[in-house]
């Protein structure tokens, strides 16, 4: 343990002796160049367009008290993007799945036969 401590002290002494003296850093950082952009004004809703001017956008109107809890804001039915498949579509789907499984099985058999030596 004494050897480790002695080695550490010697290393610190050599490192300190080999480094040139540097002036201490200032207590506070030097101020940077002033920014060219001023602080933005208070937030405002703007509509952006191709025109050179900006017009404030109107804020949303206060909603009336909902009659159905949180669902009161919705006025239309929930859209259905995919309908229920009919019997023919279900059969086609099952045929495709069966054909894909059969192809995978045949590929596996083909690779097994190629790996065998006669």
Swiss-Prot record:
GO MF, one term, reads: structural constituent of vitelline membrane
Which residues belong to any copy of the VM domain? 36-75
Keyword Phosphoprotein in record? no
Database matches in InterPro entries: Vitelline_membr_Cys-rich-dom
List the record's Gene Ontology CC terms alphabetically.
egg chorion; extracellular space; vitelline envelope
Q: Does the keyword Secreted apply?
A: yes
Supply the alphabetized keyword list: Secreted, Signal
Signal sequence interval, chain numbering: 1-17
Where is the protein localized?
Secreted
Q: Which domain of life is it from?
A: Eukaryota
Q: What is its main location?
A: secreted
Name any one Pfam family assigned in the record.
Vitelline_membr
An example GO BP is: vitelline membrane formation involved in chorion-containing eggshell formation
Relate the protein's function as given in its record. Answer: Major early eggshell protein.
Similarity remark: Belongs to the vitelline membrane family.
Q: What is this protein called?
A: Vitelline membrane protein Vm32E
């Amino acid at each position: 343990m004494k050897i480790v401590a002695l080695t550490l002290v010697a290393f610190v002494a050599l490192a300190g002796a080999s480094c040139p003296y540097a002036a201490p850093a200032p207590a506070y950082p030097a101020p940077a160049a002033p920014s060219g952009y001023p602080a933005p004004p208070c937030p405002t809703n703007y509509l952006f367009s191709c025109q050179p001017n900006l017009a404030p956008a109107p804020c949303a109107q206060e909603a009336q008290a909902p009659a159905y809890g949180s669902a009161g804001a919705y006025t239309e039915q929930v859209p259905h993007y995919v309908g229920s498949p009919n019997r023919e579509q279900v059969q086609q789907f099952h045929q495709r799945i069966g054909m894909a499984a059969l192809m995978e099985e045949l590929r596996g058999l083909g690779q097994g036969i190629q790996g065998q030596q006669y």
